[in-house]
């Protein structure tokens, strides 16, 4: 196997691993909504750890597209994860919903997908729309009026991206070309 083939296998593996973490995040997060007490808290913490995994893998995956935007997206996600953990463990009250930071994250990931050559553009549009839905949580009164409809774009965007990553991963040759052009390998 040559280096380009190794890199292609590696990026496909990373994309599928991100899909697995995303699926675990969705399943444990949804389960936390119906669970109570300690079980709900444990599921939410597991969900958040899975999202950190998605964040790290996405940072690596989208670095060739735009290193700065990929880093900014990762920062937004990590801030949202920290707020979630602190709130779940009752260590600090969340001054703002972590969904706001996840909204910024989804918007930036949508932008990065649109600029990439290795994922279909419709996924970028869905993720950006999902990010806008999560951003309605900036205003608690607005989000409560729009609920549950404001969550639908995020569920659709993140769910579709998850399935795509699990089934198709990424176009590894296109990823490799984009990473060679940007000087990121």
Where are these regions (language model features)?
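Hydrophobic, aromatic-enriched alpha-helical segments typical of multi-pass transmembrane helices
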Residues: 1-185
């Amino acid at each position: 196997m040559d280096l380009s083939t190794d890199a292609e296998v590696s990026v496909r593996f990373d994309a599928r691993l991100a899909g697995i973490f995303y699926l675990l995040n969705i399943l444990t997060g949804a389960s936390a909504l119906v669970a109570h007490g300690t079980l709900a808290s444990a599921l939410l913490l597991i969900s958040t750890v899975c999202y950190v995994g998605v964040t790290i893998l996405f940072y690596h995956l989208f670095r060739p597209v735009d290193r700065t935007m990929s880093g900014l997206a990762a920062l937004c996600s990590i801030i949202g994860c920290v707020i979630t953990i602190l709130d779940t463990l009752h260590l600090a009250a969340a001054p703002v919903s972590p969904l706001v930071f996840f909204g910024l994250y989804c918007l930036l990931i949508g932008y990065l997908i649109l600029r990439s050559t290795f994922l279909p553009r419709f996924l970028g549009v869905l993720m950006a729309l999902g990010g806008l839905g999560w951003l309605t949580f900036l205003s608690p009164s607005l989000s409560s009026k729009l609920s549950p409809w404001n969550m639908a774009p995020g569920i659709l965007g993140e769910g579709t991206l998850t399935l795509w990553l699990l089934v198709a991963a990424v176009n590894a040759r296109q990823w490799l070309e984009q990473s060679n052009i940007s000087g990121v390998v």
